């Protein structure tokens, strides 16, 4: 007897938005009204090519009726996060699980290792000498640089075979000069995540204590400088400068990638999970009323952020994860209304543990982004004056409305980089934008004086 279409394709749902630390038992509790096939074995988590959780999973159920029950859980919450549930099938599940994760065909046995702790100015010749006797493929070395063109102290090396790469791993903790070198198994996919720098970092850098506005990197400019140009050309010390050969693709199941082969669904999920990549946060708001946080303690949890905004009640918290799997110190917080997001800005420059936290508003009144009630805004500013370290200043002007510039000079580049400097007024007025730039510049000059 032939199986029905449902029988051949199985009874599967796909879950998105899971907490990073979520376990199979927690997924089973979330679907407690549904019969999951084979218990915890029926929960199939999706991992990135670096082996980190993607926040997604497939769940195998026992019948079509169980699938219908599971779909009713769409947009319900797990902890403080709402979870999306989609109908899927066994074909999609098998394909995705095969082509993702650290053991996928795209990452296994490609002979890559990653070095960390290289001396400043370490050359390719020194690395070749370090691996003397182990064959490195032609043009098989990549030396990443940061967004200012400086060496990161890391390198990626591709050997002629996986067996040679295993031998290279045995040199872990040996020295180059006075520095001991850490060596880790890597993959072509990891090289790609380092190949093109995060756009958010290229367009906005928090000034250092000795920085001065100048050519290519002023506080109020978006100058790109030599570091940007080196990275734009793929100048990672040579190496894999021709990654256009690995053109972007979309597999039809939502696992798209850019032209460097980086996953667009993860990200730094994070990173974009960059961020945590992705040319900025991968956070997608459902209400359009968000506050971006910067300067969080690296051990801050979602609960810490909920408590930080108490008595306000955020709908969702998304802590950014960088491409190295570490938190970036930034997060996006979603509120139900524009008024709640505005009220949350009263916490700008407040401390969380030992660090003060900067807040950037990303919300407009109404769906059309029309002008907000200025009497309310002025009342809010007056009620919070002095408490926020002067982060707002007197910037209700021109077509920009209110722009939340930060207190260290108000870099206007934030308004271009990640969209966190949005105002309440219509932002199509370039004259208003220019006026904000001019005021920021004059404010900064007066601060220097």
Curated annotation (Swiss-Prot):
<feature type="modified residue" description="Phosphoserine">
    <location>
        <position position="90"/>
    </location>
</feature>
<keyword id="KW-0597">Phosphoprotein</keyword>
<feature type="domain" description="RRM 2">
    <location>
        <begin position="111"/>
        <end position="188"/>
    </location>
</feature>
<feature type="modified residue" description="Omega-N-methylarginine; alternate">
    <location>
        <position position="233"/>
    </location>
</feature>
<keyword id="KW-0539">Nucleus</keyword>
<feature type="cross-link" description="Glycyl lysine isopeptide (Lys-Gly) (interchain with G-Cter in SUMO2)">
    <location>
        <position position="87"/>
    </location>
</feature>
<dbReference type="InterPro" id="IPR000504">
    <property type="entry name" value="RRM_dom"/>
</dbReference>
<comment type="function">
    <text>This protein is a component of the heterogeneous nuclear ribonucleoprotein (hnRNP) complexes which provide the substrate for the processing events that pre-mRNAs undergo before becoming functional, translatable mRNAs in the cytoplasm. Binds poly(RG).</text>
</comment>
<dbReference type="GO" id="GO:0014069">
    <property type="term" value="C:postsynaptic density"/>
</dbReference>
<dbReference type="Pfam" id="PF00076">
    <property type="entry name" value="RRM_1"/>
</dbReference>
<dbReference type="GO" id="GO:0005654">
    <property type="term" value="C:nucleoplasm"/>
</dbReference>
<dbReference type="GO" id="GO:0043484">
    <property type="term" value="P:regulation of RNA splicing"/>
</dbReference>
<keyword id="KW-0488">Methylation</keyword>
<keyword id="KW-1017">Isopeptide bond</keyword>
<feature type="modified residue" description="N-acetylmethionine; in Heterogeneous nuclear ribonucleoprotein H2, N-terminally processed">
    <location>
        <position position="2"/>
    </location>
</feature>
<dbReference type="Pfam" id="PF08080">
    <property type="entry name" value="zf-RNPHF"/>
</dbReference>
<feature type="repeat" description="1-1">
    <location>
        <begin position="234"/>
        <end position="249"/>
    </location>
</feature>
<feature type="modified residue" description="Phosphoserine">
    <location>
        <position position="23"/>
    </location>
</feature>
<feature type="domain" description="RRM 1">
    <location>
        <begin position="11"/>
        <end position="90"/>
    </location>
</feature>
<feature type="repeat" description="1-2">
    <location>
        <begin position="418"/>
        <end position="433"/>
    </location>
</feature>
<feature type="modified residue" description="Dimethylated arginine; alternate">
    <location>
        <position position="233"/>
    </location>
</feature>
<keyword id="KW-0687">Ribonucleoprotein</keyword>
<protein>
    <recommendedName>
        <fullName>Heterogeneous nuclear ribonucleoprotein H2</fullName>
    </recommendedName>
</protein>
<dbReference type="GO" id="GO:1990904">
    <property type="term" value="C:ribonucleoprotein complex"/>
</dbReference>
<feature type="modified residue" description="Phosphoserine">
    <location>
        <position position="54"/>
    </location>
</feature>
<dbReference type="InterPro" id="IPR035979">
    <property type="entry name" value="RBD_domain_sf"/>
</dbReference>
<feature type="cross-link" description="Glycyl lysine isopeptide (Lys-Gly) (interchain with G-Cter in SUMO2)">
    <location>
        <position position="98"/>
    </location>
</feature>
<keyword id="KW-0694">RNA-binding</keyword>
<comment type="subunit">
    <text>Component of a ribonucleoprotein complex containing mRNAs and RNA-binding proteins including DDX5, HNRNPH2 and SRSF1 as well as splicing regulator ARVCF. Interacts with TXNL4/DIM1.</text>
</comment>
<feature type="cross-link" description="Glycyl lysine isopeptide (Lys-Gly) (interchain with G-Cter in SUMO2)">
    <location>
        <position position="35"/>
    </location>
</feature>
<dbReference type="InterPro" id="IPR012677">
    <property type="entry name" value="Nucleotide-bd_a/b_plait_sf"/>
</dbReference>
<keyword id="KW-0007">Acetylation</keyword>
<dbReference type="GO" id="GO:0003723">
    <property type="term" value="F:RNA binding"/>
</dbReference>
<feature type="region of interest" description="2 X 19 AA perfect repeats">
    <location>
        <begin position="354"/>
        <end position="392"/>
    </location>
</feature>
<feature type="domain" description="RRM 3">
    <location>
        <begin position="289"/>
        <end position="364"/>
    </location>
</feature>
<feature type="modified residue" description="Phosphoserine">
    <location>
        <position position="63"/>
    </location>
</feature>
<dbReference type="InterPro" id="IPR050666">
    <property type="entry name" value="ESRP"/>
</dbReference>
<feature type="region of interest" description="2 X 16 AA Gly-rich approximate repeats">
    <location>
        <begin position="234"/>
        <end position="433"/>
    </location>
</feature>
<dbReference type="InterPro" id="IPR012996">
    <property type="entry name" value="Znf_CHHC"/>
</dbReference>
<feature type="modified residue" description="N-acetylmethionine">
    <location>
        <position position="1"/>
    </location>
</feature>
<feature type="repeat" description="2-1">
    <location>
        <begin position="354"/>
        <end position="372"/>
    </location>
</feature>
<keyword id="KW-0677">Repeat</keyword>
């Amino acid at each position: 007897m032939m199986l029905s279409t449902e029988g051949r394709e199985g009874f599967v749902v796909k879950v998105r938005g899971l907490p990073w630390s979520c376990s199979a038992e927690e997924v089973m509790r979330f679907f407690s009204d549904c019969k999951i096939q084979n218990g915890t074995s029926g929960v199939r988590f999706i991992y990135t090519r670096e082996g980190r959780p993607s926040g997604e999973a497939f769940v195998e159920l026992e019948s079509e009726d169980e699938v219908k029950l599971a779909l009713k859980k769409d947009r319900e919450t797990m902890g403080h996060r709402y979870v999306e549930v989609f109908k899927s099938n066994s074909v999609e599940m098998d394909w995705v699980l095969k082509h993702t994760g650290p053991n996928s065909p795209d990452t296994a046995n490609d002979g890559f290792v990653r070095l960390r702790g290289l001396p400043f100015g370490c050359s390719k010749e020194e690395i070749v000498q370090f691996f003397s006797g182990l064959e490195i493929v032609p043009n098989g070395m990549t030396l990443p640089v940061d967004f200012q063109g400086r060496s990161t102290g890391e390198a990626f090396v591709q050997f002629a075979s996986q067996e040679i790469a295993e031998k290279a791993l045995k040199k872990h903790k040996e020295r180059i000069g006075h520095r001991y070198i850490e060596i880790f198994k890597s993959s072509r996919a990891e090289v790609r995540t380092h190949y093109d720098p995060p756009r958010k970092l290229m367009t906005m850098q928090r000034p250092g204590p000795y920085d001065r506005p100048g050519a290519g990197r002023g506080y109020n400019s978006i100058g790109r400088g030599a570091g940007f140009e080196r990275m734009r050309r793929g100048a990672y010390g040579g190496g894999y400068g021709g990654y256009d050969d690995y053109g972007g693709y979309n597999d039809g199941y939502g696992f798209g990638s850019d032209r460097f082969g980086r996953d667009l669904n993860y990200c730094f999920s994070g990173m974009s999970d960059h961020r945590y990549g992705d040319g900025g946060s991968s956070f997608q708001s459902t209400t359009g009323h968000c506050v971006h946080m910067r300067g969080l303690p690296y051990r801050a949890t979602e609960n810490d952020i909920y408590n930080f905004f108490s008595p306000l009640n955020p709908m969702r918290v998304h802590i950014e994860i960088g491409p190295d799997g570490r938190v970036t110190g930034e997060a996006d917080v979603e509120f139900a209304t524009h008024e709640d997001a505005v009220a949350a800005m009263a916490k700008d420059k407040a401390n969380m543990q030992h660090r003060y936290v900067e807040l950037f508003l990303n919300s407009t009144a109404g769906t059309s982004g029309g002008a907000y009630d200025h009497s309310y805004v002025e009342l809010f500013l007056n009620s919070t004056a002095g408490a926020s370290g002067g982060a707002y200043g007197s910037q209700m002007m021109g077509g920009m409305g209110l722009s939340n510039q930060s207190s260290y000079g108000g870099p206007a580049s934030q308004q271009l980089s990640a969209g966190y400097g949005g105002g309440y007024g219509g932002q199509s007025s370039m004259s208003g934008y220019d006026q904000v730039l001019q005021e920021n510049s004059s404010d900064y000059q007066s601060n220097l004086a």
